[in-house]
Structures are given as C-alpha cells and as structure tokens.
Amino acid sequence: MSTDWKAKAEHLRFDEGKTWAQVCQALAPDFPELNPKQIEEKVRSYIRRCDRYKSNSPILVFSDPHCPFDHPNFPYFLQETAKKYKAGQVMCLGDLVDNHAISRHGAEPCALGAYSELDLAIQRLKIYTALFPEVDYVTGNHDERINRQAASVGIGARFLKDLHDVLELPEGWICRGNEFIQDNVLYSHGVNWSGKNGAINKAQVERMSCAIGHSHSFGGVQYSANSRDTVFGINVGCGVNREAYAFAYGKYAKQKETLGCGIIFNNQSAIFVPMGKEFL
C-alpha cells in the first residue's frame, strides 16, 4: 500500500484543519478493504504519532460528568478552560453517564426509570458533543453497569449494543477502551485507585505519569521523582451536580465532590483546574 495517504492526511488535518471525519472520508478510496471506523482508527493512530501533532498543544482532560446528573454549567466551564489553555485535544476518563436506574444498588424512591434517565443523559451529552466534536474517551464503572447487569443473568456483550451507539455519540468521539497511553501518559478511569493519593499511587505502580478520575473528592496533582525521572499522578476531579438524587448517598460524606478538570502539558507537567464560583 502506498504511503501517500499519510502526507495527504497530514495536509488535511494540519494545513486545512479538517475534522477527523472529513479526513477519513477523503482517504476512504485509499482503503477499500476497511470500513469507516477502521479507517478512522488507522488515520488517528498515525496522526497522533506525528511530530506536528505532538508539538506543544496542551490536553484538556475531564471525567465523571455522570449525565444526566452533571452540574448544569460543567460543559461551559470545560469550554472556557479549553480556550484559556489553548487545548489541542480533549479527553474524558469515563462515567459519561450514571445509569442510576440500573444499578445493582437500590435506586432512590424518586428515581426516573432507565429509559427516561437515558433520554435525559443523551440530551445532556449533546451539549458536550456540540462544544467538543472530537473527544477520546475511556469507559468507567458506571458506563459499564449495563454490561455487568446483563452478565449477571448470563447475557454476554455479543448481545448488547455498543455504548457509543446507546449514547448516540458522534463519530468524532472515539472510545479507547478501559485505558490507553499517549505520549508516555497513561489515561484510565481509575477503578481501584481511590483516595487522595490514588493517582500518584497508580503512577508509581505503572512507572509512568497517570491521569485518572473516579474518585470524586480528590482533584489535584502530585509528583514523584527518583534519580532517573519524574512522574505525576493527576485526579482530574468530576463534573457532578451534588444536589441530584443520584448522589444522595454522599449527603453526609466528609469529603465533598471536587469539580474541575486537568490540563496535561507533557509527561512531566500537569495542573488541576477547579471549577470557579462563577460557574457554581
């Protein structure tokens, strides 16, 4: 196969500013044997290894909006933060939705049914997808509640719709599985890495800088160094509406939700940006 498509992809993406979907549509004739999703994965994988892609743009990372129980101003806070730091890429570290109605834990008496909750979640997500047409995301434990409940009665993943389709996410939103590595930073939801030291503990075990969500109460960055390198662990906080019934369980918790997001500059530098009072 000719490598001309690589030069064409770089030109379309960097020089003409085309979206991923537009780039892949233009390159479709170069990959007659691949379907659109496979083409996008191939092109994205190549582009993200290019020096031009890696050249300096910070990454905005958010997690845990738990739609439809997200804070009403959270997407606009993300928009302002991305603009302020000139973010060139956006990532979500899971729990896009809450799935309160289908939890194995008891639902609140006032809870909506599963379909009504899903419909509202899709409406809320459309705000995020309009503001950020292209996002790389991983799945969180709340996103996977559907699969776990199905598995509990012997229904495997082959019988289920993909989460991407269930949530009606656009082509520009790409699921990267449970975790992935980009530019020597590991991005994951953070299951089993809770508490205020969860992120740095994961970074020390993984031996590389890590970004996680999951633990709502401990947004922030910690660093660890030895004689060879420095790594960070960042918990990017959450975007939940603590007044929503889905979070009634935390009414008396000592540590309240830390609303905010992360900005990753490189594999040795990151900051946590708390959501300011103007958005609360």
Q: Which residues does each PLM region occupy?
A:
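Short acidic low-complexity segments
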Residues: 164-182
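Short, basic interhelical loop/turn and adjoining N-cap
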Residues: 21, 27-45
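Short, amphipathic alpha-helical "recognition" segments used to contact nucleic acids or chromatin
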Residues: 2-18
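Short, basic alpha-helical nucleic acid-contact segments in DNA-binding proteins
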Residues: 45-53
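Beta-strand-turn-beta hairpins that frame and shape the catalytic cleft
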Residues: 53-60, 180-186
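Core catalytic region of metal-dependent phosphoesterases/phosphodiesterases
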Residues: 57, 62, 67-170
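Conserved beta-sheet core of the metallophosphoesterase superfamily
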Residues: 184-277
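Acidic carboxylate-rich catalytic motifs and surrounding loops in phosphoryl-/glycosyl-chemistry enzymes
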Residues: 137-142, 176, 273-277
